[in-house]
């Protein structure tokens, strides 16, 4: 063979080889798990169907199974549901599932899914393929699950999205993933599927959880403990049960939280456990130390290490219960709780709340507003503030609203309790310059009785909305009266509490700009300055915030309040001074926070370790000072004393001080700065009251401050800090600017506010002028310097050292 022929043969061979390689690459490309088809779909979870092998899809999964379904080992494992959407049986021999892109994954055994059938796989990490199926991985937030056919192609994928416990991600008929409060493992994602799943949940022991109530405010009064959460257990056997070996808990990690009493439960008999109630020591009641949460909670009944019954407590409406009915498997919601009696009239679900298809809020320069609603079953509505019932008008066409008012709507459907109430506020042609807050109570009569009583300590279900610059929020909450002296005034302070029983455990919204955006409590506050300058409390706290003081301070915004559609004047929406506020400031768990309201109880740990130690020991001795400084944050104490003295708060003697600490932070006591209506009236006077052994606060906080003034380090830190603030953030100019800014913010609203309560706004104008006079003409800054020099007994050289650059004396 000539060299020319050999070259021709070589070229032909290379061409053939290249063609073969190209064909192989083309064949393998769509099947390679290293680059799954439609991988980007994980950003928007949905089942991804390949061109072939798309007969089986992922139809539902749960990444935080706490009390929905147990595997054969008794564990609450994550799970994944597969659905055969074809018209023929499909063998899973050769199919794989993985939680990593490019991984071959866990191999299915030769199991068959019938046409339109479902297969449940536990993602437990146990790696079992005989009998119950368990993958070799578990589910985690922000990962994606891939289902691979025998050819290696990705037939479906689903992204885990960080759902709450016992909430599944379910694939709807239109291919969208949605969170489901009613999981259906092994059944179709529908009401019928959920009912079938529940009917398959039969009790495994003679002692069962029969009924649970997590928001009991007026249904079951238990004597001394009052109204509290409760759990009813029942003996469903025909023999006696000794309870001493059983425990009840809300935690899988601590099943023995509450041991049942050493007593016997006869056949058909029940026992009620009160949860979260204070122990009166009488031994009369069965008291579990833990309380329950209706938005996301689990309950476990155990014997030894074995869980014999469990319940997932999710989305239980206010004053409703959750439990079982005689002769029925699974769980029901009850509109009429029946502690100690047979459960009846239960429904499997709670209807979903109606949806507003148009905007609610503030509308100016309009003739009317159109309201469009949507919902399952029958939607019924009211316009008079009452909660819709089955006899209320049915929504069949858009509603026209032409004046300020409230629209409420509820869904009614067979097989479910009525939905929670949709509350819509319409503030029409009112012309407000401030943000608008709308507070709507569930029952207007009950609210009126509470507000006008006034009945402090009563909490009623309500809804709160904020409308500001075209945005805002609406959230369910509880409302109660707040404060002491203000309760006899025209505008009363109100506390807002977010709870799962109302439909939302916390409010997540950036109300104040920066800082915490999640709230358990808020205040609607008018204060004692409401008939004078209005701004004193907010002026003091705004100066505190802008000076970056090391105290726990409340943020707030001015607003106009409507209550049940009626104008109620100027208020502030603000944070509440409690453990949740300090937890947000310190970045700790609220349960780790201890708050003590002054005056501290005599003989208490705080009193003995802090107040008594300071009073009984010479704090000029560094060792004693350092010991106290290990317990009390000195910067916080100094800043609190400066702010209280600077603002001349004459109401601090009534106990408007709270100490707070957390072992998750520095463990030291910090000081809360709040309730400042009685400020800016008598300049300089409060330093003597706070920091003199003959002052009004001598009984407690003075006992802490006066001994500290004898310590050179504390004295130097205090006076240096005071001089720094008085020369800048607390200068006369800074205070005057703040007064003018707040007065300008309120000026357009004051006339209507004062007229609403039968007064004239000229008194407000006089009070604003009086504030400016005290600060400017009376030289507020100089009055503070003089007061501090007097209290500390400064010599002329010391006075010059600390205040020389700003001292006009």
Give, region by region, the residue ranges found by the protein language model:
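Short, compositionally stereotyped local motifs that mark structural "simplifiers"
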Residues: 11, 17-18, 30-47, 57, ...
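Second-shell loop/turn segments in exported
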Residues: 69, 219-221, 522-531, 627-628, ...
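Solvent-exposed beta-edge/loop recognition patches
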Residues: 25-30, 51-53, 66-68, 75-76, ...
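A structural motif detector for short, solvent-exposed N-terminal "entry" segments of globular domains
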Residues: 27-100, 138-141, 158-163, 186-252, ...
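N-terminal Sec-pathway targeting helices
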Residues: 2-15
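Middle-to-C-terminal accessory/interaction subdomains
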Residues: 186, 323, 330, 339-347, ...
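Conserved ATP-binding subdomain of kinase catalytic cores across diverse folds
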Residues: 439, 454-604
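Beta-strand signatures of extracellular beta-sandwich domains
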Residues: 96-98, 146, 247-249, 298-300, ...
């Amino acid at each position: 063979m000539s060299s020319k022929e050999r070259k021709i043969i070589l070229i032909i061979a290379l061409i053939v080889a290249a063609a073969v390689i190209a064909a192989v690459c083309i064949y393998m490309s769509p099947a390679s798990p290293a680059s799954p088809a439609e991988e980007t779909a994980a950003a928007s979870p949905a089942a991804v169907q390949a061109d072939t092998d798309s007969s089986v899809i992922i139809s539902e999964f749960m990444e935080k199974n706490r009390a929905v379904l147990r595997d054969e080992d008794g564990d609450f494992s994550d799970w994944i549901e597969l659905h055969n959407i074809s018209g023929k049986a499909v063998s899973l021999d050769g199919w794989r599932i993985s939680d990593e892109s490019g991984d071959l994954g866990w191999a299915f055994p030769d199991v068959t899914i019938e046409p339109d059938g479902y297969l449940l796989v536990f993602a437990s990490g146990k790696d079992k393929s005989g009998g119950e199926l368990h993958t070799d991985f578990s589910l985690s937030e922000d990962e994606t699950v891939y289902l691979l056919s025998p050819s290696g192609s990705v037939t479906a994928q689903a992204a885990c999205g960080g759902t709450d416990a016992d909430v599944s991600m379910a694939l709807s008929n239109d291919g969208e993933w949605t969170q489901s409060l009613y999981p259906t493992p092994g059944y179709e994602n529908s009401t019928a599927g959920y009912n079938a799943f529940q009917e398959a949940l039969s009790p495994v022991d003679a002692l069962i959880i029969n009924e649970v109530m997590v928001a009991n405010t007026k249904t079951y009064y238990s004597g001394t403990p009052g109204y509290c959460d409760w759990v009813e257990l029942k003996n469903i056997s025909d023999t006696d049960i000794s309870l001493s070996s059983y425990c009840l808990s809300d935690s899988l990690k601590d099943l023995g939280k509450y041991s049942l009493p050493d007593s016997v439960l006869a056949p058909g008999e029940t026992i009620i456990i009160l949860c979260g109630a204070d122990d009166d020591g009488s031994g009369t009641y069965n008291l579990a130390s833990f309380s329950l949460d209706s938005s996301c909670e689990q309950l476990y009944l155990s014997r030894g290490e074995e869980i014999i019954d469990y319940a997932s407590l999710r989305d239980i409406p206010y004053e409703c219960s959750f439990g079982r009915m005689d002769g029925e498997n699974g769980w029901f919601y009850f509109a009429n709780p029946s502690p100690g009696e047979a459960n009846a009239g239960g429904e499997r679900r709670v209807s979903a709340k109606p949806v507003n298809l148009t905007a609610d809020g503030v509308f100016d320069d309009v003739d009317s507003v159109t309201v469009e609603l949507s919902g399952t079953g029958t939607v019924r509505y009211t316009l008079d503030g009452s909660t819709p019932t089955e006899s209320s008008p049915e929504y069949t066409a858009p509603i026209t609203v032409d004046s300020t008012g409230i629209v409420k709507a509820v869904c009614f459907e067979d097989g479910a309790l009525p939905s929670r109430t949709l509350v819509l506020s319409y503030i029409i042609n009112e012309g407000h310059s401030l943000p608008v807050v709308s507070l709507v109570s569930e029952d207007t009569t009950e609210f009126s009785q509470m507000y006008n009583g006034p009945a402090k300590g009563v909490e009623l279900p309500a809804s709160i909305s904020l409308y500001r610059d075209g945005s805002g929020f609406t959230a369910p909450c509880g409302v109660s009266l707040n404060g002491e002296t203000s309760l006899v005034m025209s505008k009363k302070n109100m506390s807002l509490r977010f709870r799962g029983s109302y439909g939302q455990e916390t409010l997540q919204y950036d109300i104040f700009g920066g800082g915490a955006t999640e709230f358990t409590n808020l205040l609607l506050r008018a204060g004692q300055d409401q008939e004078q300058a209005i701004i004193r409390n907010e002026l003091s706290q705004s100066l505190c915030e802008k000076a970056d003081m090391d105290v726990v301070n409340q943020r707030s915004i001015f607003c106009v309040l409507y209550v049940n559609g009626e104008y109620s004047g100027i208020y502030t929406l603000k944070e509440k001074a409690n453990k949740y506020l300090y937890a947000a400031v310190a970045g700790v768990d609220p349960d780790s926070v201890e708050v003590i309201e002054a005056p501290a109880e005599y003989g208490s740990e705080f009193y003995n370790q802090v107040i008594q130690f300071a009073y009984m020991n010479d704090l000029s001795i560094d060792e004693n000072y350092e010991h106290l400084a290990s317990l009390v944050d000195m910067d916080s104490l100094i800043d609190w004393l400066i702010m209280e003295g600077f603002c001349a708060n004459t109401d601090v003697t009534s106990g408007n001080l709270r100490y707070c600490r957390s072992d998750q932070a520095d463990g030291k006591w910090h000081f809360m700065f709040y309730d400042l209506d009685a400020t800016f009236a008598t300049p300089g006077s409060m330093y003597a009251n706070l920091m003199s052994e003959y002052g009004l606060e001598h009984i407690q906080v003075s006992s802490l401050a006066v001994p500290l003034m004898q310590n050179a380090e504390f004295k130097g830190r205090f006076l240096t800090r005071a001089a720094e603030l008085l020369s800048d953030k607390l200068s006369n100019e800074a205070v005057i600017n703040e007064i003018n800014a707040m007065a300008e913010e309120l000026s357009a609203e004051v006339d209507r506010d004062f007229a609403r309560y039968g007064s004239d706004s000229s008194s407000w104008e006089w009070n604003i002028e009086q504030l400016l006079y005290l600060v400017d003409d009376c030289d507020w800054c100089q009055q503070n310097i003089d007061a501090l020099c007097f209290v500390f007994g400064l010599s002329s050289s010391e006075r010059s050292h600390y205040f020389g650059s700003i001292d006009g004396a």
